[in-house]
């Protein structure tokens, strides 16, 4: 059963909003780490982001056009926020050297080529590069769905398993390609749900069973959840635990968001989640010590950081949209030939 890929689904924006808030909470840490009991949040947080991105997949007008579009949507924002975050850190270090414990070196710009080292000046930005690779991987195999669907699924599982065991063997591929491989099954599941399942339909007779499905998902997660380190492709559990717990968490959040449908502020954050993803790291880098200076209770500190950071992101979002929309995946910097056979009303603005 194939859905209408041109129709916008409100609760997908809400899901993206919940996802980006969970990501910000994870980077704040502190008291929020206590919420991640038995890895019940971390087991699905980043897989959910890959899953949602798969929902937006469109093949467009060929491989070259697809790559150019993904450069516009992912690589240009990656480069902009990667370079601007470093320059911000470098300028502040030049003005006030005492702000950072160690000197800021131009060599830090090469960190993205050093395996899976932490990008200290903007840690979350790795996801955009990984998602770009994931898009390309799926583009190369998605044509099989027309006549060789079992083969497409088999290749998806093979690529996912290969990425997972590369992590277990501590073999790192450049530019997060191994992580993209591990994440591919989540991305493909999002694509499949979007096009061939009633799950995303606005209403269905099974919707009344959502509370039951959510409870079942929680039970599955309780018995299978393990810690995921997707940035480093490092997983404490076995392959069954990792994928089963992640999918249980994904469907739990999706079902809850389908029930709620829309929350204005959270849905807004979700619709333009690429902005919050790209700027909350530098904000926390400077805001964290300031908040810690005046607030000493762990929970008050974490909540204050979350509210202030999200407020700054919400305030800056319309500025980015108006001033530099090309840098936040809202307009194309590199022009591509339009294919009018594709419906652009639900384009993949991650």
Model-based region annotation:
Residues 1-350:
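Alpha-helical transmembrane segments and their immediate juxtamembrane cytosolic regions
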